[in-house]
């Protein structure tokens, strides 16, 4: 008898651990490996079903007593900037975001390290080495890319390249129905630029220009201050028991 390779993903459940978003809660996750020639297709389906990707793992919360994590995606074609978002967009019009293959660099890691040390010193990623960072970027079988944001240089209008220092980076999956922002980081010394907001706005513009309807932001947790920024980008949809439901804020 000829052995047939496993095509359907196998799912596993993590042990309980402290929730990083809600104090006093415990979290569990269901996860599967994204490998093989079906990795892109499976990643698309799972992301549309509320999963997130980390390296070659797709996961989603499977907590026993809590359902606070809600998957969020922006409706790129209907999105309208608020006055404050227009200010952020204009303030950063000296930046150029350039798409690269998902390959790490020492310059990226230096910015990543600076970001973690300033913003997430006690977080779960705080002790990541340069090798850990390289794995985060490269260890994938799906269609993903790096977007580097730099200041415009004297020849930027000719070359379409930013010539200045690297000030922000996004790791982004390109899916059949949208862009999924896997992880992003930026210079912690440029608070006035609101670079996190700017990168989301840039992804919305990129998705709309490519004819992709959605930008996936991951999970929103009501009551978690670090997650509140996600519901400012409307209209958006939240994934619930009845599927994706429109949310206007």
UniProtKB/Swiss-Prot annotation:
InterPro entries documented for this protein: Acyl_CoA_acyltransferase, Asp_Glu_LeuTrfase, N-end_Aminoacyl_Trfase, N-end_Aminoacyl_Trfase_C, N-end_Aminoacyl_Trfase_N
Pfam families: ATE_C (PF04377), ATE_N (PF04376)
Domain of life: Bacteria
GO biological process: ubiquitin-dependent protein catabolic process via the N-end rule pathway
Catalytic activity as recorded in UniProt: N-terminal L-glutamyl-[protein] + L-leucyl-tRNA(Leu) = N-terminal L-leucyl-L-glutamyl-[protein] + tRNA(Leu) + H(+); N-terminal L-aspartyl-[protein] + L-leucyl-tRNA(Leu) = N-terminal L-leucyl-L-aspartyl-[protein] + tRNA(Leu) + H(+)
Known EC number: 2.3.2.29
GO molecular function (one): arginyl-tRNA--protein transferase activity
Localization per Swiss-Prot or TrEMBL: Cytoplasm
Predominant location category: cytoplasm
Coiled coil: none
Gene Ontology cellular component terms for the protein in this record: cytoplasm
PANTHER family, alphabetized: ARGININE-TRNA-PROTEIN TRANSFERASE 1, ARGINYL-TRNA--PROTEIN TRANSFERASE 1
Primary role: Functions in the N-end rule pathway of protein degradation where it conjugates Leu from its aminoacyl-tRNA to the N-termini of proteins containing an N-terminal aspartate or glutamate.
UniProt family annotation: Belongs to the R-transferase family. Bpt subfamily.
Protein name as annotated: Aspartate/glutamate leucyltransferase
């Amino acid at each position: 008898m000829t052995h047939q390779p496993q095509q359907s993903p196998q799912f596993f459940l993590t042990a309980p651990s402290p929730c990083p978003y809600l104090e006093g809660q415990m979290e569990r996750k269901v996860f599967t490996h994204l490998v093989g020639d079906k990795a892109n297709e499976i990643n698309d389906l799972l992301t549309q079903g509320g999963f997130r990707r980390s390296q070659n793992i797709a996961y989603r919360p499977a907590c026993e007593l809590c359902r606070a994590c809600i998957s969020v995606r922006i409706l790129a074609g209907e999105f309208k900037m608020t006055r404050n978002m227009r200010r952020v967009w204009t303030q950063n019009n000296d930046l150029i975001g350039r798409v690269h293959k998902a390959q790490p660099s020492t310059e990226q890691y230096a910015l990543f390290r600076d970001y973690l040390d300033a913003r997430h010193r006690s977080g779960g990623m705080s002790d990541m080495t340069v090798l850990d960072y390289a794995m985060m970027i490269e260890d994938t079988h799906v269609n993903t890319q790096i977007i580097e944001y730099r200041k415009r240089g004297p020849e930027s209008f000719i070359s379409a390249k930013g010539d200045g220092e690297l000030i922000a980076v996004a790791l982004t999956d390109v899916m059949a129905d949208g862009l999924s922002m896997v992880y992003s980081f930026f210079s912690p010394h440029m608070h006035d630029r609101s670079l996190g907001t700017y990168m989301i706005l840039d992804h919305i513009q990129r998705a709309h220009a490519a004819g992709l309807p959605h930008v996936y932001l991951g999970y929103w947790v009501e009551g978690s201050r670090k997650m509140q920024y996600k519901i400012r980008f409307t209209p958006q949809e939240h994934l619930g028991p009845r599927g994706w439901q429109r949310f206007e804020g």
